[in-house]
Amino acid sequence: MIDTTWVIILSFLLFAIGTFGLLSRRNLLFILLSLEIMLNGIILLFIAASNLHGNNDGQIMYLLVLTLAASEVAVGLALVVQIYKQQQNLDVDTLTKLRG
């Protein structure tokens, strides 16, 4: 079995990679993917902390964050598709306003 310390280190690495992608990328789709990587790091940390303390609260939080991530992806991808249809571009720097 993998030691809990390594799982916690992996979760922080995932969160750091997601943060780097969020801050360095300008494409809206890559920003959305970076947010998902960050959420996966948080989910992994909840499960590792739950295993470390011997209770199931982290697994319940896993289900809550997973549901939140799924709804975020659905809304985010719908917005990305609409922005691409209107602007033909997903660069955050060039998107100044959204017209209805």
Swiss-Prot record:
Purpose: NDH-1 shuttles electrons from NADH, via FMN and iron-sulfur (Fe-S) centers, to quinones in the respiratory chain. The immediate electron acceptor for the enzyme in this species is believed to be ubiquinone. Couples the redox reaction to proton translocation (for every two electrons transferred, four hydrogen ions are translocated across the cytoplasmic membrane), and thus conserves the redox energy in a proton gradient.
Protein location: Cell inner membrane
GO cellular component entries: NADH dehydrogenase complex; plasma membrane
Membrane topology label: Multi-pass membrane protein
Family indicated by similarity: Belongs to the complex I subunit 4L family.
Broad class of enzyme this protein falls into: translocase
BP GO annotations: ATP synthesis coupled electron transport
Spans through the membrane: 4-24, 28-48, 60-80
Organism: Shewanella woodyi (strain ATCC 51908 / MS32)
Main localization, broad class: membrane
Name by which UniProt lists this protein: NADH-quinone oxidoreductase subunit K
UniProtKB keywords: Cell inner membrane, Cell membrane, Membrane, NAD, Quinone, Translocase, Transmembrane, Transmembrane helix, Transport, Ubiquinone
Domain of life: Bacteria
Stretches of the chain forming a coiled coil according to its record: none
Catalytic activity line of the entry: a quinone + NADH + 5 H(+)(in) = a quinol + NAD(+) + 4 H(+)(out)
GO molecular function: NADH:ubiquinone reductase (non-electrogenic) activity; quinone binding
InterPro entries, alphabetized: NADH_UbQ_OxRdtase_chain4L/K (IPR001133), NUOK/Mnh_C1-like (IPR039428)
Known partners and oligomeric status: NDH-1 is composed of 13 different subunits. Subunits NuoA, H, J, K, L, M, N constitute the membrane sector of the complex.
EC number(s) from the headed UniProt entry: 7.1.1.-
